[in-house]
Amino acid sequence: MAREIETKCIHLEEEENSINHYGAISYPIYQSATYAHPGVGQSTGYDYSRLQNPTREHLEKTVASLENGIDALAFSSGMAAITLMMELFKPGDHLIVDADLYGGSIRLFNHVSEKNGIEFSSVDCHKENVAAYIRENTKAVYIETPTNPMMNVTDIKALAEIAKKHNLLLIVDNTFLSPYFQNPLDLGADIVVHSGTKYLGGHNDTLAGFLVTNREDISERFRFLIKTTGAGLAPFDCFLIQRGIKTLGVRMDRAQENAIEIDKMVKRTGYT
């Protein structure tokens, strides 16, 4: 039976702990840089926390489950996640990106990625014909929906059909709706981006970023890159984000209720 997202937010952690960690409700913080082994040639599966850490892996399993992906990777910030994602592309590749994006993403694309030879076309993806901007060297479409800051909404499913037709990756920043209200992978996206600093964390006390995918080839590439670049999220920050996720449902419901009330007030007063 499929689980409701509220159940995933809370009980995935409890079930794993009941088997492996003495029944503790909260997953332990493995604040260790290195790990001992039983003997020569015998490994616990953990060597060095830049490569793998149990607390980080547990958080990644949770986020992958929330987004219905096969793998999620936790980063030190949302921009660290996007920066690593750009390593999928090489000089001469072209990306179509939404005209309204988070300022940090625009800065990365315009001042770092372009310097490295990647080309961009900025398109209002919520209203323009994206297919008209596809070139021979186009490799991906990158959007936010809703966008930051203008809250433009793009039809992910329709855009996914265009991307698949032209063999392009569809990358969706899902920060503003969170997995509680939207699952881009279910609508045809290949990669989901999150700033965990926002709704996933929810307490304004830590930075985090995530990449989620439902493709084995992309997962393998991301795993190689995160081990190589050392951009993984620290154990204590993983604990804080995991704590925040437990209340994701109630927080998102309240945010939605507040937004509806604000909309009613604006319409009632005639303020525009």
Residue ranges with predicted function:
Residues M1-N53, L59-T62:
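N-terminal "arm"/small-domain region of PLP-dependent enzymes with the aminotransferase-like
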Residues R3, A24-I25, E57, N68, ...:
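Short, basic and Ser/Thr-rich N-terminal targeting/leader segments
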Residues T34-T83, E87-L88, G104-H111:
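Conserved N-terminal alpha-helix of the aminotransferase class I/II PLP-enzyme fold
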Residues N17-S18, A72-Y271:
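Conserved PLP-enzyme active-site core in the AAT-like
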